[in-house]
Amino acid sequence: MDEKVYGYMDWPRIEAIVYGEETAPRDVMGPRITQDGVLIQGFFPDAEEVSVISGKKTYACEKEDEAGYFAVLLPVRKVPEYRFLIKMGETETECYDPYAFPCQITEEEEKAFCAGVYYEAYKKLGAHPVEIKGVKGTLFAVWAPNAVSVNIAGDFNGWIGRATIMHRMPMSGIFELFVPGVEAGTHYKYEIKVKGGEVLLKADPYGNSADHDPEGASVVADVSAFQWNDGDWMKERHRFDDRKQPVSIYETSLEEWKSAEELVEFLAEEDFTHVELHPVMEYLDDITGGYSTYAYYAPTSRFGSVADFQKLVDALHQAGVGVILDWTPAQFPRYASGLEKFDGTPLYERQNPAEAIHPFWGTLLYNYGSPMVKDFLISNACFWAEVYHADGLRMDDVDAMLYLDYGRNPGEWTPNIYGTNENLDALEFLKHLNSVIKERNPGLLLVAQENGLWPELTDSVENDHLGFDYKWSGGWTKDLLEYLSKDPIERKNYHDQLTMSMLYAYCEHYILTLGSRDVGTLKDFADKLPGSEEQKNAQIREAYAYMMLHPGCKMMAPDKDMPKELEVFVKDLNNMYLAHPALYQLDDEYDGFEWVQLMKYEENVIAFMRKTEKPEETVLAVCNFAAIPYENYNVGVPFAGKYKEIFNSDDKKYGGNGVVNTRVKAAKKAECDEREYSITLKLPALGVAVFTCTPEETEKKPAAEHSQIKKSITKTRTVRKAAGKTKAAVKTAVKPVTKKVTKEAPQIVNKTEEKIPVKKDLTEKK
């Protein structure tokens, strides 16, 4: 044994390395300049022989400990470039020394992390393929402040974690290490030794890819390699900060689509402005529908690779469709390899075990008082916006975040310092999150699903509120579906459920939803409604049309395999919405809506106007929720002029009976609804008729109506330049990333030859 080498051995530290308790291996292993040369040490548990190759020379290492600790003293004064040559049996492997590379996380980044303001934590924590000093490898970093030690186990080292010991940063408790030669596609986990000696095998919280099998191993992925083609879209995304833009969202699950191409073509053809996708982040149990997120920084591998999901978003943007992702920052699942007691202590979850468990799902609730947990979640939101170009996040289960007593009985929760039930840490976190997102990503939509009636949820953080852009209008959906579930004969007794929404329509910025959670499939929707199959279909069309006309953004989820008639209906509905500024420009202002007929409960009819500052842009909507049509129905109008029907849910091309108004209506000077002028129209059973209102003095436009609509659609969607791409062009932009999970779609239209009775006397009762 070389006495000089032996004399440099730090035996207590070597013992800590051998027994898996060393937290600063870079201080011991790697190169170190001494008065006798450059000392190089390494730990290779299963190696028979180890040498150091430097230039054209090879230096044999001595085994200083039988556990596999090797060292050599090079007769040089400066640290040279070198590699290890490791012999195991007949196999020889060359590798660079991971401890020859300095820490890649700066002191400033570490301080920001400890303060809860490291919004780009996703760039350093996790596993990132990088090149340092001409050497390619992967930078690993994980936060585990209470761990005794942390190792990396994976494909690259035969899952022997004790051979790859991570270095602890003392201020933050981040363990980091650059491992040369590790490439994208490598599977890995962290071996975390906790107090008491137990070793936990954990997936990477910041990992960019993961398996969805029960083991849930993390996978090294390069999320920066993709070449985006949506520059025009990203430059214009800030426009959605202006709430005067139309927002029509199609909610869908990725598993419903055979390919990305199919989804992109459908959305572009149907003229939706946005799509809300789920499930996106990796999850393990299919039964959860993707709402028990396992890997927050990884798109689920069920439907393709990291690059495949980036291609999907890129193609959607090129087709003029914004992308909203479902996000679950309220709770996380309890998996042995997940976030629960990540380093042997409650790190991500609330400290009190009794209050850490979600009362309904049995999952764990986040500790929003921890700066590092805030880093994890805020950085995650920034990650999806900045790395995957997401245009919005829909936050699930916000109630569980806001209320300490959510789902709990007295005695099962602890009040805050003021003796109330608000989660003060969660409130601060949400304000912090929304402020950061708005500053870094103007135009990104933050949507809350919250049913606890938290006041002014969508008011600004500057006004000391939470700063969401929108919240789901659960009250509107509940009232409408309850009303529609009644037999039309009984609906007059529930008329206020139809009209009540306008009493609170301006309390928040709402998204009206008839999504999968609300109505399920089309068959499920039909099962909620009374009447014959034809009447059910008519009511589905009426519900969608009423939603599109009511103040608020829109979200729907009709089956992708919907009947052709309904597909045409949805496209025309979106076209009408996009073409008429009155249907969206003043959604949040009282001046944008005016009742015409509010109390026609005997007839089951409501009528209202949607308006802008220009009278000629006024739209009149008349909705009949009775099972019988009205042949000569009088409606008061705002002024003398022409009233042209631009949409009717009973049109035969939609599967209706054709009770429509083909001729332009001239307002007559006959008082109705306390208005000087009125029109008489045909009103279909269980249907909606929509009219444009042109004042008498307004000059007739020279262009055709069809041309006007198309121009208006183009104007409201200025960055949707690729919406008219050919199918061939779309095919070149994407490749299949989804699997097909088909469900038999119900036949939504079933015409009959039976004549529909026309009710002429409005005073007569059915």
Indicate where each model-derived feature is located:
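Intrinsically disordered, polybasic Lys/Arg-rich low-complexity tracts
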Residues: 699-766
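The feature marks proteins involved in alpha-glucan
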Residues: 1-35, 59-144, 169-251, 657-662
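Beta-strand-rich binding/interaction modules
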Residues: 40-42, 46-58, 142, 147-162, ...
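C-terminal beta-strand-rich structural cap/linker in extracellular carbohydrate-active enzymes
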Residues: 78-83, 184-188, 663-700
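Substrate-binding/active-site clefts of carbohydrate-active enzymes
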Residues: 209-211, 217, 225-249, 253-258, ...
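Conserved alpha/beta catalytic core and glycan-binding cleft of carbohydrate-active enzymes
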Residues: 389-391, 406-558, 578-635, 639-650, ...
